[in-house]
From Swiss-Prot:
GO cellular component terms listed in the entry, alphabetical order: host cell endoplasmic reticulum membrane; host cell plasmodesma; host cytoskeleton; membrane
Main subcellular location: host cell
Keyword Phosphoprotein carried by entry: yes
Effect recorded for R155A: Reduced cell-to-cell movement
Organism: Barley stripe mosaic virus (BSMV)
Cytoplasmic topological intervals: 1-59, 152-155
Pfam families associated with the record: Viral_Beta_CD
Taxonomic path: Viruses, Riboviria, Orthornavirae, Kitrinoviricota, Alsuviricetes
Keyword vocabulary terms for this entry: Host cell junction, Host cytoplasm, Host cytoskeleton, Host endoplasmic reticulum, Host membrane, Membrane, Phosphoprotein, Transmembrane, Transmembrane helix, Transport, Viral movement protein
Annotated stretches, region: Required for attachment to the host plasmodesmata-associated membrane compartments: 150-155
UniProt protein name: Movement protein TGB3
Length: 155
């Protein structure tokens, strides 16, 4: 039957020796009151810089991984075509109707008025969408970085 030792015990079984645990840069810990403040795990395992960083910034790392996961989900969902109904493609010489189901009256109206707007929409609307997408991509990055920095700042 094993006898439990108190935390302030300085016997050879409680203290790690360099023969049984060869650790680079290990310093001999004298038996003192500071040893009673450490846990047995802290006596055995030396402090690791990476572990300290992970402990200090755990929520910031989780938040950044969550933001990356949301960004990847956005990329995936934006790559899936959302047009399930009929739509049309027109070239200068032909007009083709694609899709499932009955043809939408709006599609027919867009085909009849293709001289006014060759691709079924106003060129100004397409330009506005491209300008907005150019402006919103850096803003989302700035928002994500500021959110990461806000979470990683120590209180």
């Amino acid at each position: 039957m094993a006898m439990p030792h108190p935390l302030e015990c300085c016997c050879p079984q409680c203290l790690p020796s360099s023969e049984s645990f060869p650790i680079y840069g290990e310093q001999e810990i004298p038996c003192s009151e500071t040893q009673a403040e450490t846990t047995p795990v802290e006596k055995t395992v030396r402090a690791n810089v990476l572990t300290d960083i992970l402990d200090d910034h755990y929520y910031a790392i989780l938040a950044s991984l969550f933001i990356i996961a949301l960004w990847l989900l956005y990329i995936y969902l934006s790559s899936i075509p959302t047009e399930t109904g009929p739509y049309f493609y027109q070239d200068l010489n032909s007009v083709k109707i694609y899709g499932i189901g009955a043809t939408n009256p709006e599609v027919i109206a867009a085909i009849h008025h293709w001289q006014k707007y060759p691709f079924g929409e106003s060129p100004m609307w397409g330009g506005l969408i491209s300008v907005l997408s150019i402006l919103l991509k850096p803003l989302t990055l700035v928002f994500a970085l500021s959110f990461f920095l806000l979470l990683s700042s120590k209180r």
